[in-house]
Amino acid sequence: MTIDNSKKTSFGFRQVNEKDKAEMVGDVFDSVADNYDLMNDLMSFGIHRLWKKITVETAGLREDFKILDLAGGTGDMVKLMRSKISNQGSIILSDINWSMLHEGRNRLIDEGIEDVQMAQIDAQYLPFKENTFDLITIAFGLRNVTNKKTALELSLTHI
């Protein structure tokens, strides 16, 4: 009998090895990127849009904010936040999954929002200097991060 000493983390309703989760999550989002918002609408009866709107309205955004949206996927949070900041501010849409980031970029461009930077990054490994941002958001993407504590602690060092 072999003993599995690898660290476990949640993936849906089951526990998986931490080292396997990122690839599993990637496979899921590669397959759903173009229908992701529709899936969220169906699963939450559209309430996710209200939650995101309330989040943006209560975030205390200023015109000059520098914002990083982690696990930003299709860009719906970025779209809401972009209207609240001026050209003095900036937003980076980021996601670990290229398919989601590509979908987000296309949707933002279709909406006439072309001044948002894009970055394919993992929320657990931020490639920015500390204290770079005024606000870091991560909507529902936190559920897909392998080590949530690491990602949240790291985010705090970058605000």
Identify the role of each PLM range.
Residues M1-G26:
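N-terminal auxiliary segments of SAM/dcSAM-dependent transferases
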Residues K66-L126:
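Class I SAM-dependent methyltransferase SAM/SAH-binding core
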Residues Y36, I136-T137:
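Hydrophobic beta-strand segment of the Class I
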Residues V145-L154:
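A short, conserved alpha-helix within the catalytic core of class I
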